[in-house]
């Protein structure tokens, strides 16, 4: 039995159903909760422990993520649902704890999340920091206000909890962006120059608003759950 066949069998055993497991040249793993298809990427340098992590994660969606339409932003739902299903998989299959820990460690060592050269992780969007934190980076910092949402993500029990928190987080992120834009839109007096001083050229001062990340509200059903894509597969 090949390694691919072993991982496919493992996925079916964990999910307790005859899932369709496909191995494709794709950037990351995913699970289609509607068609019950688990897709695993074909990566050249990934270890068996990383594949155990991917299988454990996507089977978590197979077991615990319902096949229903949602009215919350998909990106936010995905992050929070990942937290919930991984916690539940570790509770259901304690032996997977080591696979998750060592698998994420390997992914971080390979800069899977693409933030190795980010000077300050505190500057990236809040929802991304939540994702990185729960995927093995406990050095991520949160403000006391943000920590309330992080703790809430850790306590989600049902998919309904996930939806509600995703909407709250989305609104929180929007409020922060709106406040930032209002701050950038404040009229700043033009600098005054003494025209009597010779040899001094008038320098134009530009104030550019900080570009905000686009939190898109997804209208489509939340059916396909994917793992983060690596830089190099």
Q: Predicted segment positions?
A:
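Surface-exposed beta-strand edges and flanking loops
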Residues: 23-25, 209, 226
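Accessible peptide chain termini
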Residues: 1, 223-224
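Pan-zinc metallopeptidase signature
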Residues: 109-223
């Amino acid at each position: 039995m090949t390694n691919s066949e072993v991982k496919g069998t493992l996925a079916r055993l964990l999910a307790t159903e005859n899932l369709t497991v496909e191995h494709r040249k794709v950037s990351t793993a995913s699970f289609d909760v509607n068609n019950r298809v688990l897709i695993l990427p074909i990566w050249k340098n990934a270890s068996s422990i990383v594949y155990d992590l991917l299988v454990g994660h996507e089977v978590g969606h197979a077991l615990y993520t319902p096949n229903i339409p949602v009215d919350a932003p998909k990106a936010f739902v995905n992050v929070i649902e990942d937290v919930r299903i991984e916690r539940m998989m570790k509770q259901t299959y304690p032996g997977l704890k080591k696979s998750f820990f060592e698998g994420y460690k390997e992914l971080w060592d390979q800069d899977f999340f693409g933030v190795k050269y980010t000077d300050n992780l505190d500057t990236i969007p809040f929802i991304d920091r939540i994702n990185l934190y729960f995927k093995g980076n406990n050095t991520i910092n949160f403000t006391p206000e943000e920590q309330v949402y992080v703790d809430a993500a850790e306590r989600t029990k049902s998919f309904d909890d996930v939806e509600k928190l995703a909407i709250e987080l989305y609104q929180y992120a929007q409020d922060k962006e709106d406040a930032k834009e209002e701050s950038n839109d404040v009229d700043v007096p033009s600098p005054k120059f003494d025209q009597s001083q010779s040899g001094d050229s008038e320098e134009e001062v530009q104030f550019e608003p900080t570009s905000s990340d686009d939190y898109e509200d997804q209208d489509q059903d939340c059916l396909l759950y994917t793992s983060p894509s690596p830089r190099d597969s």
